[in-house]
A protein has these predicted regions:
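Active-site glycine-rich loops that stabilize anionic/oxyanionic intermediates
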Residues: 41-44, 97-98, 120
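Conserved serine/cysteine hydrolase catalytic core
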Residues: 190-237, 241-245, 249-255
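Active-site catalytic motif of lipid deacylating hydrolases and related acyltransferases
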Residues: 31-87
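Post-His helix in hydrolase/transferase enzymes
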Residues: 252-266
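Gly/Ala-rich beta-loop-alpha elbow adjacent to hydrolase catalytic centers
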Residues: 94-99, 103
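Secretory targeting and sorting signals
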Residues: 1-30
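Flexible "cap/lid" loop of the alpha/beta hydrolase fold
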Residues: 110-111, 116-159, 196-199
Length: 267
């Protein structure tokens, strides 16, 4: 499927080049608008992107919000790749939180730019938990009792079981999304998905962000991934970086600003 998409894209590029060489105006349809793929992070599901996705669709973008299984970078990036395999043409790949780890492990020739929203952006051999190192990057409140562990059924785990982490409901609003309304926080809690503890300890592969046009939105009031850690990762990537006065859940609390950055990356 990826090969077919690549051939289609190459053929379209050739047609555009030939038309441009002939001095003929290129019609709007000949420059396909990228499809935006939004990858959610831990303690969330695709509905966390609803506000952003709605704004992008309102501007004419095709948007996909695949399910991130939250099992580990290798497994989860394969799941996202399957979603990308359904897309013809260029792709803007966006990740929030742990979703940044996942998109950093997706290598697709049709990706033209990447956007990280308060997200992990590991380099090769790193694991996400290193970005929460309390010595280098103090400030995360994602600790017990806010962070809890439970056993779950999981085909990826040993003997079909695994240990997952989740945010205790009574701490979710204060730790994860302190800048959203009570009703919004309650809806986010209802959609919370737990993550395999091993996922944040699995070494990342070669980063797809290397050599790629990248944008990074730092959540300046983040209580999950310290802002200093986010700025370090963004700087290492060479990303175009902006700060939002927002919680970790900036995609929910500030969907206009997040959507605007994605549109910039898609232009």
């Amino acid at each position: 499927m990826t090969i077919i998409r690549t051939l289609r894209t190459a053929l379209l590029s050739l047609i555009i080049a030939l038309v441009a060489t002939a001095g003929v105006a290129i019609p709007a349809w000949a420059a396909p608008r990228p499809t935006v793929v939004l990858v959610h992070g831990a303690f969330a599901d695709p509905t966390s992107w609803n506000g952003v996705a709605g704004r992008l669709r309102g501007q004419g973008y095709e948007v996909l919000t695949p399910v991130n299984p939250l099992r580990g970078p290798a497994h989860d990036s394969a799941a996202v790749q399957r979603a990308l395999d359904t897309v013809d043409g260029p792709i803007v790949l966006v990740g929030h939180s742990y979703g940044g780890t996942v998109i950093s492990n997706v290598h697709d020739p049709d990706i033209v730019s990447m956007v990280y929203v308060a997200a992990f952006a590991p380099t090769q051999g790193e694991f996400a938990q290193q970005a929460l190192d309390p010595v280098r990057f103090p400030g995360s409140r994602l600790l017990p009792p806010a962070l809890q562990v439970k056993a779950v059924d999981d085909p990826q785990g040993i003997a079909g079981r695994n240990l997952d982490g989740y945010v205790a409901p009574e701490y979710f609003h204060d730790v994860f999304a302190q800048d959203v309304a009570d009703a919004t926080a309650a809806d986010m809690i209802a959609h919370q998905q737990s993550i395999a503890l091993a996922a944040n300890l699995e070494p990342s592969g070669a980063p797809s962000w290397s050599g790629m046009p990248t944008w990074y939105l730092v959540s300046a009031q983040d209580r999950v991934i310290p802002p200093a850690s986010q700025r370090f990762m963004a700087g290492r990537m060479g990303a175009q970086t902006s700060d939002l006065d927002a919680s970790h859940a900036s995609l929910v609390s500030q969907p206009d600003a997040v959507a605007a950055t994605i549109v910039t990356a898609a232009s």
